[in-house]
Amino acid sequence: MLKNIFHNCLSLLLFLSFLFSQASPEKRLDAKYYLVSYTKFKEGKKQEGMEIIQKYFWQADREINRKVLPFDFITGEWDHIVFFPLEDGTNELDWITSPVNAKLWKAMVKEIGSEDEVKRIRQQFDNCVMKSKQELAFTQY
């Protein structure tokens, strides 16, 4: 019995020393951060939604030279996923409207012709979407 108590206390001390040895501050080096956007389209609306993405959203991203990484799924829950690079890392999340999003908006207005028309197209796209979510990711490669 005493041997078991000693063994358990020793195990706890070893675990705690390991836990605290890992508690020192450590920063990710050379991390590139992405906002990852997942989209599931309504039944029968995938083609329309993808046409809007290709015609307007991709064009605006090219105009501002933002290197997005889009993927279309063959299987699984989602239809479309895009990795949007956060040029200023996680600091970009501090903005209500980031400088990149402001440039994107201006590029879309320039391409489409007016803010009202951009809003209409955005609403048309939103009407194609059944659900969406966004997550943060990073890579150090």
What do these predicted regions represent?
Residues 10-11, 25:
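Intrinsic structural disorder/low-complexity segments
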Residues 13-22:
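Hydrophobic h-region of N-terminal signal peptides that target proteins for export
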Residues 1-10:
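Bacterial N-terminal signal peptides that target proteins for export
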Residues 21-141:
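Short S/T/G/P-rich N-terminal loop/turn motif that feeds into the first structured element of a domain
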